[in-house]
């Protein structure tokens, strides 16, 4: 366990958790109740180990989120060094030593010269500027404080700041701030709801963080906060989407194909959420329509069902890939996809059954076909027949990843050609063999679960308010004020 200003301390074998209520009564607790960033606590130590922790009843306070920064060069949390300054004067705390620096004074820390816990604290109103990192807007600036630690011969950097201020830089990184105000407010509520769910979870607890700053959670500080993003957050302060007696899972994506997916069909979740069910998005209504049959889904794409996303260039798209290209895409990525989750890539055995064996070499591709779709029409399983092996690939993301490549040229609905995408725009596509090539015809951009950002913007342009937008995309939900996390 890492304790602020104390470092890492081992837990005693008999380690216990207790609650101290405001009336002085002490009750036993569970280790699972410990949360990252917990400050309302006292620790009991003996012989260099923590024996117990006493959790105090929380007073109303500003919720803080801890974000571990990702090194975009190697897609890990490991940095060989970090160079920083600040927009104001700032203090560096190294162990018990505190040193104040002027704003113009740059500091460089390396994995070789960091031997203890480092905290960087800007003066009031200041931001930490990371000179050794580049984002879309240049060297990023961060509200809050930095904590820097040496972990396995590399530096880990955690940015701790108030949740609402974190959202200032999430909203512009996830949605263009030129979008309608009510759409930006809906995005802010979604981002807040998502963050609160992550703060209650423990995905990155071992690293001392709640989330990272990448697409693995929600993109943070890739674009600079601005007046529009700050207003969207401030005007919805504390508001979350609430459904099924808890803060909802507020997923969002760029453009729908005229349908909304469920989490079970996209991420193979154990069960769907009542507010995230597969359906067709028709104007102001949500119509249940089974698009699992290939012919029905193909007809749906061609009919271009009118929805809020119908004006988007990515509402419909097409690309052609040669057999040779497709074989190259798959061979380059199949091993890494298998290693991510072996159960999602299965090889045909001599008796006709399919198992995850690691034998993923296809040889020459003979046939590619979608064998299963979700109710929303999203492709969830495909079979690729090769001269050496026949594979079954599961999940829309695996299919998008394996069938796509940066060299593909997409013809969008607006007749413009676009390339450079590492995977297919969405899992809503059909495959047609023509000569020695395959034609992929699809719709939408993103996973298709939750709120379409483009759709939200169109709803706002037509006069819909933030709450109406959220209730449309998260059916049966309500907006609720969340006092604390």
Regions found by a protein language model. Name each.
Residues 1-485:
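Conserved, single-site charged/polar hotspot
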């Amino acid at each position: 366990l890492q304790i602020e200003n104390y470092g890492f301390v081992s837990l005693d074998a008999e380690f216990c958790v207790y609650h101290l209520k405001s009336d002085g009564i002490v009750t036993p607790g569970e280790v699972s109740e410990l949360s990252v960033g917990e400050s309302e606590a006292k620790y009991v130590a003996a012989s260099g180990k923590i024996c117990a922790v006493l959790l105090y009843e929380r007073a109303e306070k500003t919720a803080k989120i801890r974000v571990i920064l990702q090194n975009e060069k190697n897609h890990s949390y490991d940095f060989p060094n970090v160079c920083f300054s600040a927009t104001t004067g700032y203090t560096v705390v190294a162990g018990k030593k505190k040193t104040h620096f002027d704003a113009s004074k740059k500091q460089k820390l390396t994995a070789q010269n960091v031997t203890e816990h480092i905290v960087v604290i800007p003066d009031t109103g200041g931001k930490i500027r990371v000179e050794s990192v580049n984002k879309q807007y240049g060297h990023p600036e961060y509200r809050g404080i930095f904590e820097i630690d040496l972990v396995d011969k590399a530096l880990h950097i955690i940015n701790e700041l108030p949740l609402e201020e974190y959202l200032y830089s999430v909203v512009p990184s996830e949605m263009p701030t030129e979008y309608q105000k009510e759409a930006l407010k809906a995005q802010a509520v979604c981002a807040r709801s998502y963050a609160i769910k992550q703060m209650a979870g423990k995905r990155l607890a071992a690293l001392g963080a709640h989330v990272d700053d990448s697409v693995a959670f929600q993109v943070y500080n890739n674009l600079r906060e601005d007046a529009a993003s700050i207003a969207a957050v401030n005007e919805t302060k504390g508001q979350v989407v609430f459904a099924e007696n808890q803060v909802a899972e507020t997923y969002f994506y760029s453009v729908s194909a005229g349908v909304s997916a469920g989490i079970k069909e996209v991420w193979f979740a154990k069960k769907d959420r009542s507010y995230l069910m597969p359906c067709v998005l028709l104007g102001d209504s949500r119509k249940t329509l089974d698009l699992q049959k290939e012919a029905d889904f193909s007809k749906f794409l061609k009919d271009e069902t009118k929805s809020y996303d119908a004006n988007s260039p990515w509402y419909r798209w097409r690309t052609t890939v040669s057999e040779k290209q497709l074989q190259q895409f798959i061979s380059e990525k199949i091993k890494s996809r298998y290693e991510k989750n072996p159960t999602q890539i299965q090889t045909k055995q001599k008796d006709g059954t399919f198992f995850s064996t690691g034998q993923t070499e296809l040889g020459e591709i003979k046939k590619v076909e979608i064998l299963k779709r979700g109710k929303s029409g999203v492709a969830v399983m495909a079979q690729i027949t090769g001269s050496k092996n026949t594979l079954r690939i599961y999940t829309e993301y695996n299919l998008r990843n394996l069938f796509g490549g940066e060299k593909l040229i997409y013809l969008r609905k607006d007749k413009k050609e676009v390339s450079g995408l590492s995977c297919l725009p969405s899992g809503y596509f059909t495959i047609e063999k023509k000569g020695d090539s395959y034609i992929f015809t699809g719709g939408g951009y993103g996973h298709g679960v939750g709120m379409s950002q483009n759709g939200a913007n169109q709803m706002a342009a037509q006069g819909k308010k933030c709450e109406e937008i959220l209730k449309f995309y998260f059916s049966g939900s309500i907006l609720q004020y969340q006092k604390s996390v």
